[in-house]
């Protein structure tokens, strides 16, 4: 291998003056070097000592990371931009390969992050179920102990009521533990509920009302007070008639009608005042006659009417 490397170096050294290699071999290559093209991906080889062989890579003591001492050459084209003009030949051993493709993550593999929550939820559910089962077991144990105490107390009470003759004294009975509460009554079956329809309910209610009415009718009735609404209900149909009193006219004296006119009242007052004088004069002369004011028929004036209106000075239009 060392001889081949020496031959390659000699060939490169000899051909450096004539420039019959690389980009100076033809016009096409010269034009291509002047074009701003991106370089193709290249393969880099790392040289290791031949004595160590493949065991050098697998040895735990040796460094597996490449260093500058292990690299034979460094490709400087990666750091250069695409606009670099390649005027000189690249040094080193170069092999053209395909472009490097980024590694894709395989989605078919199960992800640990998605599996962990499901396992945690299953463990939580299992813990809750175990706790419920343990609570039920403790309740069953308590009920069994209570039942055993009740049975034992009943047996002891039976033995104390009928003691054997000449036998040992019976120990005092233990205080009985209160029995557990009775279970709730069973719910009626749906078939019974369906048969008990609304028609039956109506019939039962009517029967109850009829029984109540019969009980009320059989009970002694109290004297009820007359209702005024019933008394006054037919008052509009009653017709009234005038009744004259049959009394003798001789026994009853007609009352003098008092005058309502002011002039008549004054004349009546004067007549009463000077009645004794008129009597004396009439006895002496016998010819004097008192002319009393004639009673004019009194006309009642209405309270409201045209007499209350004030005159405006206009003529009445006929």
UniProtKB/Swiss-Prot annotation:
<feature type="region of interest" description="Necessary and sufficient to promote mitochondrial fission">
    <location>
        <begin position="168"/>
        <end position="296"/>
    </location>
</feature>
<keyword id="KW-0175">Coiled coil</keyword>
<comment type="similarity">
    <text>Belongs to the MTFR1 family.</text>
</comment>
<feature type="region of interest" description="Disordered">
    <location>
        <begin position="154"/>
        <end position="193"/>
    </location>
</feature>
<feature type="compositionally biased region" description="Low complexity">
    <location>
        <begin position="154"/>
        <end position="164"/>
    </location>
</feature>
<dbReference type="InterPro" id="IPR007972">
    <property type="entry name" value="Mtfr1"/>
</dbReference>
<comment type="function">
    <text>May play a role in mitochondrial aerobic respiration. May also regulate mitochondrial organization and fission.</text>
</comment>
<feature type="coiled-coil region">
    <location>
        <begin position="124"/>
        <end position="157"/>
    </location>
</feature>
<dbReference type="GO" id="GO:0007005">
    <property type="term" value="P:mitochondrion organization"/>
</dbReference>
<dbReference type="GO" id="GO:0009060">
    <property type="term" value="P:aerobic respiration"/>
</dbReference>
<feature type="compositionally biased region" description="Pro residues">
    <location>
        <begin position="165"/>
        <end position="189"/>
    </location>
</feature>
<dbReference type="GO" id="GO:0000266">
    <property type="term" value="P:mitochondrial fission"/>
</dbReference>
<keyword id="KW-0809">Transit peptide</keyword>
<dbReference type="GO" id="GO:0005739">
    <property type="term" value="C:mitochondrion"/>
</dbReference>
<keyword id="KW-0496">Mitochondrion</keyword>
<feature type="region of interest" description="Disordered">
    <location>
        <begin position="101"/>
        <end position="121"/>
    </location>
</feature>
<dbReference type="Pfam" id="PF05308">
    <property type="entry name" value="Mito_fiss_reg"/>
</dbReference>
<protein>
    <recommendedName>
        <fullName>Mitochondrial fission regulator 1</fullName>
    </recommendedName>
</protein>
């Amino acid at each position: 291998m060392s001889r081949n490397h020496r031959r390659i170096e000699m060939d490169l050294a000899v051909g450096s003056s004539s420039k019959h290699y690389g980009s100076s071999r033809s016009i096409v290559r010269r034009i291509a070097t002047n074009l701003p093209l991106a370089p193709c991906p290249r393969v880099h080889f790392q040289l290791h000592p031949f004595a160590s062989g493949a065991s050098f890579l697998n040895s735990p003591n040796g460094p597996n990371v490449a260093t500058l001492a292990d690299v034979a050459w460094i490709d400087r084209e990666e750091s250069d931009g695409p606009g670099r003009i390649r005027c000189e030949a690249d040094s080193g051993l170069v092999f053209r390969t395909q472009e490097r493709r980024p590694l894709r993550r395989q989605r078919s593999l199960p992800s640990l992050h998605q599996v962990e929550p499901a396992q945690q939820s299953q463990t939580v559910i299992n813990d809750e179920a175990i706790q419920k089962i343990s609570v039920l077991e403790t309740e069953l144990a308590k009920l069994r102990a209570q039942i055993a105490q009740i049975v034992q107390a009943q047996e002891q009470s039976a033995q104390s009521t009928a003691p054997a003759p000449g036998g040992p004294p019976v120990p005092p009975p233990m205080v009985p533990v209160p029995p557990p509460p009775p279970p709730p009554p069973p719910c009626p079956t749906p078939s019974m509920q369906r048969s008990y329809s609304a028609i039956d309910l109506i019939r039962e209610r009517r029967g109850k009302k009829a029984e109540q009415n019969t009980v009320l009718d059989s009970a002694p009735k109290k004297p009820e007070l007359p209702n005024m609404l019933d008394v006054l209900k037919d008052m509009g149909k009653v017709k009234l008639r005038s009744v004259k009193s049959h009394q003798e006219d001789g026994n009853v004296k007609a009352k003098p009608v008092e005058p309502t006119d002011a002039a008549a009242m004054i004349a009546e007052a004067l007549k009463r005042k000077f009645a004794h004088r008129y009597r004396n004069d009439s006895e002496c002369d016998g010819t004097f006659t008192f002319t009393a004011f004639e009673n004019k028929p009194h006309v009642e004036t209405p309270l409201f009417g045209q007499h209350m209106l004030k005159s405006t000075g206009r003529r009445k239009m006929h």
